[in-house]
Amino acid sequence: MGSKLLTNRLGSLLALALVLACSAAQAASEPDTLVIGYHRTANNFYPGANSALPNIMVNMLLYDSLVIHDHKGNLHPALAKSWEKSNDGLTWTFKLRDDVKFHSGRKFTAADVKAHFDTWKSLPTAMKIDALEEVKILDDYTVQCRLKYPTLVFLTMISQTEWSYSGIPDAEAVKKYGKDYGVLPESVSGTGPFVLKKWVRAQAIELERNPDYKWGSKIYQNAGPAHLKKVIIKTIPEEAARSAALERQEIDIDLSLSTKDAPRLKGKMGLAVLATPQLTVHTIGFNHKKPMWQDEKVRKAFMHAVDQKAIVTVAYNGFAEPAQGFFPEAMPGNLPKEEMAKIFPTYNPDLARKLLDEAGWKMGSGNVRVKDGVPLRFTIYVYTETQAQLATVLQEQFRKIGADPAVKLMEYAAWQKAMREYEHDMRYVDGTTSSPDGASYWYVCNSIPYPNHVYWCDEKTDEFYKTTQTTLNERERLKAFGEFERRLIEKAVIIPMPHTMMMVGVWDTVKDLNLHPVHGIYKLLDAKKPGK
């Protein structure tokens, strides 16, 4: 009986997958239905459950938060109509909208805010609200947040723009489904402009317009409902397959357009290729739990082995800028350029070899260094084709100094699991951030094992980060970020990788897309796809 049920279940899932795949292909030509191609797959729609970009992208559409930033970084009301801060900076009181409903039909109240913030404090992204002591309900539409210490960044940390961790789920749905909330499609209930209707993992996500939505923030011209009736997000990991789907108009948008295909597609009538600078923080990370990487000289040797210009040319086809620090140059709080130039390891393979010699790694047979009988052999874990191309360039550069690296391309979920179980030797991670806070908390002790999957735990690093979160002096806060960055570079915690552009291919049938410089499609309230 059990076997028969399992067979039926698998058959149903396969049928649903085929329906979604076929419907997505048809929908790309349908008005009011937006079909998006993306290279990674979502795995959880519980806000704050993890920091995976596919989850965050969809959660922007499913949920709202108390406040939100516009496309220029200005803060605006969302589920909160207004707020007040006490003179000592420790108490924030929010007046909530009273006209908001969840997708379940239940009214949104202060109890939902308290429930999510209380839960968030135990989630992997809890460092974002480290300052939060407690949440009190004053009445159905008034909530009060008490902080452990005053901070300049509390509103930023609870803005939906800061990765949608603060999106408020339906507390009753969370209670009903428990650990399955955000994992089962039927569990998800937010207040956002779109409702989750279908979800086949690693294949497609189908969202429908929330017809009751009328409380959109003023960052959009349209307060709701959305103009689009349906949004389908297709997972297409292979770059060539995604570009082909775009070219055949099986998808309307490729949100992660291949830099190899961009020049060719740019000349196609009706198809726009958008290359937009982003605040990206991409890094190669050493697993500091592994003995090989516990010697600072070894880590610095590998930093000197990296030729950033070659990576930009080969892996990114010129659509990137060589890294000159951990933070991108346009990021507030980065170490001044002239100071970073004094400490940032330049490409110098001779110096890299010298440092390895000094660290006791001597050249052995097959041009592979050995120390205490252990070869300088390791694996770089990646999860996209572009990352694999980049890692292949690094592979050749590292071989020149006597290392024997392998590259392991994995499905994103498997990569995440490997990070949490610290099986990796070295990993590549790409990220886009709206603030220096968003990139920094990955490298503090309390973020181990995720998102601090380099397992770096250092008292000074934590002190600098704490200053950024607790000082009430903006100049001191930015200076602390600079010292945080200095520490990462001087201790060779990671190897910064080139800062990339947002590469998007979009057909001219899509109107008023208004891409966000960090989050891309963002909330899609103004976007249209009218019929021909």
Predicted regions and their residues:
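Extracytoplasmic/peripheral linker and loop segments enriched in polar/acidic and small residues
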Residues: 345, 354, 405-415, 440-508, ...
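Long beta-strand-rich cores associated with HINT superfamily self-processing modules
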Residues: 504-532
